[in-house]
Amino acid sequence: MHLAYPAVLSALLFCTGLYGVLARRNAILVLMSVELMLNAVNLNLVAFDVWLSRAAEETLHSGQALTLFTIAIAAAEIGIGLAIVLAVHRNRGTSDIDKLRDTAEGHEPDGPDTDTPATGTAAEKAEATA
Amino acid sequence: MTLAAASHGFLSPTGVEIAFLLVGLVTLGAAVLTVTTRQLVHAALWLVVALGGLAVEYLLLTAEFIAWVQVLIYVGAVVVLILFGLMLTRAPIGRSPDADSGNRWAALTVAVASAAALVWVVVDAFRTTWIELDGPAAGSTAVTGASLFQNWVLPFEALSVLLLAALVGAIVLSRRTKAARADEVSRAGTPQGQQGGVR
């Protein structure tokens, strides 16, 4: 098989995931796009490992081992990421990443819609630590 | 390199290449739909198609073990987690008009530019490179297991510790503290407690 086929497919998948990360607004959709990017990298690793296992004399099968590691780390990442999104949703009532601007510079809160949950969260945090 | 190019027809694809191309088109289409559809649950279901297509691509590249791990972990576990996340954040069923943010044209520009650059570089670099798919499978369970437990034992064990830490972290993050729970119960009746319901 021509090596360009899997390489081009993985490049296109990666850019699809890149678009999703930049353009999506819901945090879970952003996580799904991150999964697409990780899968593109996995396809690259597998394709080059299969190529090198024929072309090279001695190979550690590092591509497939790294693919397994990437899959495990992606599973850990999606678990932690969803836990964070759920915690944010519980505190703010939204998983919209455009509205999470508390640490952004130069952005005043847009209105009472974003202001009220933020103060509510601060009060909640103070209550939780007390 | 020229010998390799001579022994393979450049524009006469083999059956495996045609199958790879077709499955790749399906995978890419499903991925594009995943990042463009306005229905959140449909995005998760298109993600299943994309990840399953990638598993078929792994099988075509003779990496069997990776393919089955992909089916088990991604299609089995990760997508179920994502669907649960969508349900728990009360994602609306049906079209949600604000799924895309305002900077989607900038995102499209960046994505198309990087896709063009990457495809150009990759095609230019590996124009005369072929993968030999004949002979024993490069990624059978025996081969992968042998290399994993001979050369990659220490990273493997470190990764298991990392998974454990991530699981404990996820549990700690998603556990409700007593104060937060009492607070939520006390204001469950007020409209502010249900504010984020439909969004």
Swiss-Prot record, chain A:
Q: Which domain of life is it from?
A: Bacteria
Low complexity composition-biased segments: 114-123
Q: Which GO terms describe its molecular function?
A: NADH:ubiquinone reductase (non-electrogenic) activity; quinone binding
Q: Which family does it belong to?
A: Belongs to the complex I subunit 4L family.
Q: Where in the cell is it found?
A: Cell membrane
Ranges annotated as spanning the membrane: 3-23, 28-48, 68-88
Where is region (Disordered) located? Answer: 97-130
Q: How does it sit in the membrane?
A: Multi-pass membrane protein
User: Chief location of this protein?
Assistant: membrane
EC number(s) recorded for this UniProt protein? 7.1.1.-
User: What keyword terms does UniProt attach to this protein?
Assistant: Cell membrane, Membrane, NAD, Quinone, Translocase, Transmembrane, Transmembrane helix, Transport
GO CC terms of this entry? NADH dehydrogenase complex; plasma membrane
Q: What does this protein do?
A: NDH-1 shuttles electrons from NADH, via FMN and iron-sulfur (Fe-S) centers, to quinones in the respiratory chain. The immediate electron acceptor for the enzyme in this species is believed to be a menaquinone. Couples the redox reaction to proton translocation (for every two electrons transferred, four hydrogen ions are translocated across the cytoplasmic membrane), and thus conserves the redox energy in a proton gradient.
Top enzyme category: translocase
| Name under which the protein is recorded | NADH-quinone oxidoreductase subunit K 1
Instruction: Mark out the compositionally biased spans (Basic and acidic residues).
Output: 97-110
State whether it acts alone or in a complex, and with which partners, per the record.
Answer: NDH-1 is composed of 14 different subunits. Subunits NuoA, H, J, K, L, M, N constitute the membrane sector of the complex.
The record's Gene Ontology biological-process terms are: ATP synthesis coupled electron transport
Fetch the Pfam families from UniProt: Oxidored_q2 (PF00420)
Recorded catalytic reaction(s): these are:
a quinone + NADH + 5 H(+)(in) = a quinol + NAD(+) + 4 H(+)(out)
